[in-house]
Curated annotation (Swiss-Prot):
Serine/threonine-protein kinase that may function as a signaling receptor of extracellular matrix component. GO terms for biological process: cell surface receptor signaling pathway. SMART domains: S_TKc. The active site is at residue 554. Induction: Induced by INA. This is Wall-associated receptor kinase-like 1. The gene is WAKL1.
Length: 730
């Protein structure tokens, strides 16, 4: 009897030992060289996790992640970490995790000042390059947590990048007019002001300061920062100036093309499709963010550490803290988040034969681990569902459903797509499906389950404070039904940023057809005149025929698409705004494209329907001359295409600047008539410009009655026609 008992105990112990050893047999390989003692892990009290590193080339992934530990000039015992490639002092580094699609680096940025005490010796520092993170392989970008902040009295702060995009704000210390509210919660223009970064996320930033009209000669500062200021907590400008820096935030990620990054990790989920678990206890996801594909890795549930180090994810002890094993058993830690209770050794009388006991225990262990695997899959699926619900609610999905159901009989006018449906339509947002990228987002070509071809626009960022306004714009744009306006078919709100679905336009944009010398399609004068008439008709509809007037705010040839018959389609309503029937203008932060921007709007920040007329006038000049709105030669002279054209009109030499491709075959009377109309659209004062309906009617008359046209080019209202120059040289 004792012999049988001993055999049974031996079998039980052997089976349990094999099960535990099997699950942990694959011991992680030794860490990569970043864990070497020659690589410093901290500098100046700041932790430097891999892929960042200090020391030899094996201590960091590549040059973009190299950190140099320098001693300060004031104290040789104090060290500070610097990012080598962009030469900025590091304040903090954090790794990506399952809740964030990218890592974060906080750095010290400069303060641009004007009229401060120390400026007298070195001259005013009213224009400083704040940051440049461009370059081949750069993983950095400015996050949308950053703001342009200006502090002082009578200050106008502007931010520019290499693509001449601009935003700015103005601060004053004058008392507000009666009825205007002053808030102490945010900087809205009293003592300080702030502006969000443009959705294009510029990578090379310069901050400029100017004295606004009537501004005092006092200290003024401007800077880019991820901190929030208000009139109640902002300090005096001199304190910012004397401090010499502010903190701003960079995001970073791993590009999918980084082959060295792939080879370093033991995580199995490194393909664009599929998922799984790895021997190194880490998982990686493929995703697409802000126009770039990236990998995001994290330790599996039950493990902790750095997933970017080989063997960096280590098992957490699940037996630590409370467990329910009781007095007759003890807790045994299992790999991952699990633990088991093992009975304390004692002599028991077996109720079943020893061999059968071993088989049952082995089968139980097998069922346990199979169940554990499916439990992990279920948890992951549930987490994705909860994230989709969270994004749907945050992005205004409930509000959109309410808006659609309140439209009498028009519920079908705009469809709400699921993220799964759009991932399937675009092959999981494959790079091969990209049609183009712009300031508002990336556009993919997709095919829905019914076989229809659509354009799927994945936005880069949406202001959460204006989500209700964004939803109202979706409902409004979905009601637009015009043959020369790209139709909005629906949207998806289950992702981090909303996705819009438009009808697919196959022949690209007007800019490429006009300026790409390799394009084999000939843009004759008849085609150009027809396109101008179609654009004018679409804008007339938006201004007056729609249920609510809509100002486009970004009319340019890259936003004019051409369908299979080369008919014009107005697109890109990312900056459009609707107004009530009795509104005459919108007061907004200055945003637009240089070369097309209304000078009156640039100075007053008040956008009217006549501002769209000015931009359309620039498009007319492009169609006539075949020249780009901005060129290197004219930029050096401080002139855009509009100024160049009006000078030619004034000197009666318009014929000299007509596009050589249409000069011989075009009807000169029609070209000159359109040129005269363009001059009216480019009038310096908005009130002297025609409205879009008048422009549309005039273009129709020019096409239908060429024999009745007056082709004289005498100067009329020369002083009124001359536009105010917008100097884009900083």
């Amino acid at each position: 009897m004792k012999t049988k008992t001993s055999i049974f105990q031996f079998i039980v112990a052997s089976v349990l030992t094999l099960l535990i050893n099997d699950s942990s047999a694959a011991t992680p390989p030794p860490p990569i060289s970043n864990s070497s003692t020659s690589c410093n892990k901290t500098c100046g009290g700041i932790s430097i996790p891999f892929p960042f590193g200090i020391g030899g080339k094996d201590c960091y992934l590549n040059g973009w992640y190299e950190v140099i530990c320098n001693t300060t000039t004031s104290d040789s015992n104090t060290t500070v970490p610097l990012l080598s490639m962009i030469n900025r002092e590091v304040v903090n580094i954090s790794l990506p995790d399952s809740n964030e699609p990218y890592g974060l680096v906080q750095i010290k940025g400069p303060v641009t000042s004007l009229g401060c005490s120390s400026n007298t010796s070195e001259g005013p520092q009213n224009s400083l390059p704040v940051l440049n993170v461009t370059g081949k392989g750069s993983p950095y970008f400015l996050t949308d947590e950053n703001r342009l902040v200006a502090v002082g009295c009578g200050i106008k702060a502007l931010m520019t990048d290499t693509e001449s995009e601009i935003l700015g704000c103005e601060s004053s210390c004058e008392h507000r007019k009666s009825g205007e509210e002053v808030t102490n919660l945010i900087c809205t223009g009293y003592r300080c002001c702030q502006a969000r970064l443009p959705v294009g996320r510029p990578q090379a930033i310069t901050v400029n300061i100017e004295n606004s009209s009537g501004g005092e000669e006092t200290c003024k500062v401007a800077f880019l920062t991820d901190k929030r200021y208000s009139p109640s907590n902002v300090t005096e400008p001199e304190q910012f100036h004397n401090n010499g820096y502010v903190v701003l935030e960079l995001g970073w990620y791993f590009a999918t093309s980084n082959s060295r990054f792939k080879s370093l990790l033991g995580c199995t989920n490194m393909s664009r499709k599929g998922s799984g678990f790895s021997d190194d206890n880490c998982s990686c996801e493929y995703d697409y963010f802000s126009g770039m594909s990236y990998r995001n890795c994290y330790c599996d549930y039950g493990y902790t550490g750095n997933p970017y180090l080989r063997g960096g994810c280590v098992d957490t002890d699940s037996c630590e803290g409370n467990h329910n094993c009781g007095e007759d058993a003890h807790c045994v830690n299992m790999p991952g988040p699990m633990s088991m209770c093992r009975p304390n050794p004692k002599i028991t009388k077996p109720t079943k034969p020893p061999v059968l006991q071993g088989i049952l225990i082995g089968l139980s262990g097998l069922v346990f681990f199979v169940g554990l695997f499916w439990l992990f899959k279920l948890i992951k699926k549930r987490r994705n569902i909860n994230r989709s619900k969270k994004f749907f609610k945050r992005n205004g999905g409930l509000l959109l459903k309410q808006q659609l159901t309140t439209k009498d009989g028009n519920v079908e006018m705009s469809k709400i797509f699921s993220s799964k449906e759009l991932r399937k339509a675009t092959d999981n947002f494959s790079i091969d499906r990209v049609l183009g990228q712009g300031g508002q987002g990336t556009v993919y070509k997709g095919m829905l389950v019914d076989g229809s071809i659509v354009a799927v626009k994945r936005s880069k960022v949406v202001d959460e404070d204006k989500m209700e306004e964004f939803i109202n714009e979706i409902v409004l744009l979905s009601q637009i039904n015009h043959r020369n306006i790209v139709k909005l078919l629906g949207c998806c709100l289950e992702t981090e940023v909303p996705i819009l679905v438009y009808e697919y336009i196959p022949n690209g944009d007007l800019f490429k057809r006009l300026h790409d010398e390799s394009d084999d399609y000939t843009m004759t004068w008849e085609v150009r005149l027809r396109i101008a008439i179609e654009i004018a008709g679409a804008l007339t509809y938006m201004h007056s025929a729609a249920s609510f007037p809509i100002f486009h705010r970004d009319i340019k040839t890259t936003n004019i698409l051409l369908d299979e018959k080369y008919r014009a389609k107005v697109s890109d309503f990312g900056t459009s705004r609707s107004v009530t029937l009795d509104q005459t203008h919108l007061t907004t932060l200055v945003a637009g494209t240089f070369g097309y921007m209304d000078p009156e709007y640039f100075l007053s920040s008040q956008y009217t329907h006549k501002s769209d007329v000015y931009s359309f006038g620039v498009v007319l000049v492009e169609l006539i001359t075949g020249e780009k709105p901005l060129s290197r030669v004219r930029s050096e002279e401080g002139r855009g295409l509009a100024t160049h054209f009006l000078e030619a009109m004034k000197e009666n030499r318009v014929i000299d600047i007509i596009d050589i491709r249409i000069k011989d075959e075009s009807k000169l009377e029609q070209v000159m008539a359109v040129a005269k109309l363009a001059r009216k659209c480019l009038n310096r004062k908005g009130k002297n410009r025609p409205n879009m309906k008048e422009v549309s009617n005039e273009l129709e008359r020019i096409r239908s009655s060429p024999e009745d046209l007056d082709v004289r080019t005498e100067n009329e209202d020369e002083e009124e026609d001359q536009p105010m120059a917008i100097n884009n040289k900083r």
